[in-house]
């Protein structure tokens, strides 16, 4: 059981954090859940809140901290987590490596995943993720719910005994280690000025809490973070090479690949990484989980359940995203990675067109509006009446010919602004109230 002395240690040794670089999105509510993919900067945003408070007013707990794991070892909250015979994994949060093993358990709800396979319906995969996680938890030894309740009860008693603490920060919360229902009960019974939680779980919701999705660095944010380049072309090259990981600008370029690979091996099993590699084939293309299963089956022992469960996990933890065709939610969705440099991390092969499309998708996510694809458009943002085409190397005159060909489709979609993203070309043409702007990447990325 977590002892008072253990909590006292963490209370007296809160993290020191300086030099925070503001992000486009920040905390606006005293009760906030920060969620996002690995290496998106969640811990940094959370710790920046701490830096503005008096030390005796805060309790900060990194739930992936090895020292905290030792403190709760008797309750075995972190025990019995395996990754299908792989060695224990360790979590790397935004500023340090801390253990968080992955779980690769058999899934009992085969029927639901099989129906998803037949229909190739990523919506069903998403709905099945809850069953995947719940069944994985059932494979663990002991009652995680009781251990979670004991853990949060100890924190509550410590807060009651130290009334000067008005702010609680829980970093790296994982539903693989703690019951969400226990966290909900715990949060509902507290009277704090601030309660901030960070997690990779996009489905974590608590009554009275605002939710802040933190994305990897946009190009604009990368420029603010990276101080090694001062010319726009070198900035673009560095961004495309290093990716949008929040810690990457502070790592020597030669060490970024090793760091990124360490993130993966620390948080995913060998089987999950193989599934990730297969996902690369579907970037900016119609996704099929069944094709991934078919590709892997001759090479490794794997079930459809494991494939669909892993896809559900990757989506829930914001590692992959799916893009629907407008007006046709049942159609196959396109896949994108939250970290657009995943191909270089996982393979020696390059595909600039797919990577560039993924880069632009990540930039558009920052607009916080619905995105779709259509037959004519790579990306369609109906709320902004905007369409986006990716044509990196064609001259403006050739692009304008395509603009004329799809003009009727743009009218039907009520698009008034067509953005054509290029690597270097530029130009503008307006026809019948619809404006086509050919923009170099940096102008497009910095225009929002």
Where are each of the predicted segments found?
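Structural recognition of the conserved hydrophobic beta-strand(s) that form the central parallel beta-sheet
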Residues: 171, 192-200
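Accessory nucleic acid-recognition modules appended to NTPase machines
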Residues: 259-382
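Interdomain motor-coupling "hinge/lid" segment immediately C-terminal to the ATP-binding subdomain
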Residues: 199-285
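Walker A/P-loop nucleotide-binding motif
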Residues: 30-45
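N-terminal pre-Walker A segment at the start of P-loop NTPase domains
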Residues: 1-25
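Conserved P-loop NTPase "ATPase switch" module shared by AAA+ and STAND
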Residues: 158-179
């Amino acid at each position: 059981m977590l002892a008072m002395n253990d909590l006292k240690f963490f209370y007296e040794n809160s993290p020191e954090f300086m030099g925070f670089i503001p992000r486009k999105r920040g905390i606006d509510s005293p009760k906030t859940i920060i969620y996002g993919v690995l290496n998106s900067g969640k811990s940094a945003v959370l710790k920046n809140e701490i830096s503005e408070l008096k030390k005796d007013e805060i309790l900060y707990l990194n739930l992936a901290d090895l020292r905290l794991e030792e403190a709760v070892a008797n309750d075995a909250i972190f025990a019995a987590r395996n990754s299908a015979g792989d060695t224990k994994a360790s979590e790397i949060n935004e500023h340090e490596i801390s253990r968080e093993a992955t779980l690769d358990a058999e899934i009992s709800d085969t029927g639901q995943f099989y129906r998803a396979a037949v229909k190739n319906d990523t919506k069903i995969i998403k709905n099945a993720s809850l069953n995947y996680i719940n069944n994985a938890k059932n494979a663990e030894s002991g009652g995680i719910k009781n251990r979670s309740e004991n853990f949060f009860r100890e924190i509550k008693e410590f807060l009651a005994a130290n009334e000067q603490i008005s702010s609680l920060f829980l970093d790296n919360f994982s539903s693989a280690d703690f019951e969400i229902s226990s966290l909900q009960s715990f949060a509902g019974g507290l009277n704090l000025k601030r309660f901030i939680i960070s997690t990779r779980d996009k489905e974590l919701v608590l009554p009275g809490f605002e939710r802040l999705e933190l994305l990897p660095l946009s190009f604009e944010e990368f420029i603010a973070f990276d101080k090694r380049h001062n010319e726009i072309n070198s900035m673009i090259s560095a961004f495309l090479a290093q990716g949008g990981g929040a810690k990457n600008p502070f790592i020597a370029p030669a060490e970024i690949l090793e760091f990124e690979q360490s993130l993966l091996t620390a948080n995913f099993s060998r089987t999950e990484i193989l599934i990730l590699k297969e996902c690369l084939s579907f970037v900016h293309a119609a996704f099929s989980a069944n094709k991934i299963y078919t590709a892997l089956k001759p090479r490794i022992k794997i079930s459809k359940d494991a494939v669909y469960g892993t896809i559900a996990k990757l989506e829930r933890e914001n590692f992959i995203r799916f893009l629907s065709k407008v007006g046709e939610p049942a159609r196959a969705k396109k896949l994108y990675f939250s970290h657009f440099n995943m191909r270089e991390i996982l393979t020696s092969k390059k595909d600039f067109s797919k990577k560039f499309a993924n880069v632009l998708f990540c930039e558009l996510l920052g607009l916080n509006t619905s995105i779709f694809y259509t037959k004519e458009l790579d990306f369609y943002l109906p709320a902004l009446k905007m369409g986006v085409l990716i044509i990196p190397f064609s001259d403006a005159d050739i692009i304008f010919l395509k603009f004329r060909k799809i003009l009727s489709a743009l009218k039907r979609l009520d698009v008034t602004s067509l953005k054509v993203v290029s690597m270097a070309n530029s130009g503008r043409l307006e026809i019948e109230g619809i404006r086509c702007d050919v923009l170099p990447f940096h102008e497009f990325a910095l225009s929002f």
